[in-house]
């Protein structure tokens, strides 16, 4: 992910449970428990490495979703992110596909989804 503000981006993703070290330069990466690696590069570094690089335009430049431990955790995570000063795109709702869902916006205007499976209704 290319970021305009490394420290603010790290602060946001820590609220979502990403265990990431404090940034010390223009590149940072974190390995999630599943083995997926998230990597950040400062906008200044990218412009230095690729002078012709242009920032992507439009909505949903990346697709990133974090699974929460429960429907209540979706609500709590959304509230924690918003309370920390970040924006909500859409507050928690029960989606027709069987998940509790919410959308928040990271410091670089990427929409990040939060979700958890809803309990299966009993007859």
What are these regions (language model features)?
Residues 1-4, 23, 29, 31-32, 38, 52-123:
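Vicinal oxygen chelate
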Residues 1-47:
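Core segments of cupin and vicinal oxygen chelate
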Residues 1-11, 16, 61-66, 116-123:
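N-terminal beta-strand motif that seeds the catalytic metal site of vicinal oxygen chelate
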Residues 8, 42, 52-55, 59, ...:
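A generic structural signal for ordered alpha-helices
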Residues 11-15, 77-82:
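Short amphipathic alpha-helices in soluble, non-transmembrane regions
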Residues 16-21, 69, 92-94:
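Short linear motifs in intrinsically disordered
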Residues 46-52, 121-123:
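A short, acidic/glycine-rich surface segment
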């Amino acid at each position: 992910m290319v970021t305009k503000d490394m420290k603010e981006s790290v602060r946001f993703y820590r609220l979502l449970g990403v265990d990431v070290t404090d940034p010390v330069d223009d590149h940072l990466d974190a390995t999630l428990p599943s083995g997926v690696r998230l990597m950040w590069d400062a906008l200044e570094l990218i412009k230095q490495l690729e002078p012709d690089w242009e920032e992507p335009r439009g909505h949903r430049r990346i697709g990133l979703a974090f699974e929460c431990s429960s429907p209540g955790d979706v609500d709590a995570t959304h509230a924690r992110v918003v309370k920390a000063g970040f924006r909500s795109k859409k507050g928690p709702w029960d989606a027709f596909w069987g998940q509790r869902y919410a959308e928040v916006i990271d410091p670089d205007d990427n929409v990040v989804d939060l979700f958890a499976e809803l309990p299966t209704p009993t007859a």
